Amino acid sequence: MKLSTAEMLSVWRLRQQLEPLRSDCVVSRVDGTDTDALLLQHIDDWYETLLDTTPAEMLVLTDVSSQVAMNNLGEGMATVILPERCRRVVDVMASDWQQPAVIVAPDSPLALLQDNVYSRAGKSRPVAVVDRRVLRLYGVDSKSRLSRLLCVMQPDDGFYEFNKRALSTISQL
């Protein structure tokens, strides 16, 4: 589902039990808190956490394999420059791998093992190291091609994009 800021604000108001409003009485104040601004801060915090940490099945995934180039470095290594709006890499598969790569952070023990040619990953258990916008692949050869690269992408400003099940992660304020 893809929601605009106004639509997302409406969903949050409903989930926070701030709507539906009673229409049989009117109260007017000018010294109150800007509820919409406060809710928008909570929405943005929730959404950033959602994009970065929530299980992939709750998010919209984009295959960017056709939009990027794989630079083969030899010795079983390659690099890919990720698109600017890529928030998180979820799945990587090369044409000659037996399974998708294990995706790790650059400071993980498995990533550090890739620095040594003797402990480096192979085709049977490839490794992908995500370091900001650079994806380092291990277990590739000169004929390898990127067949799948699924990413969580930052949507256009003013929009929120996710699976409807992600709404269940909204907590009460």
Residue ranges and their predicted role:
Residues 1-126, 130-173:
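Glycine-enriched, solvent-exposed interface loops adjoining structured elements
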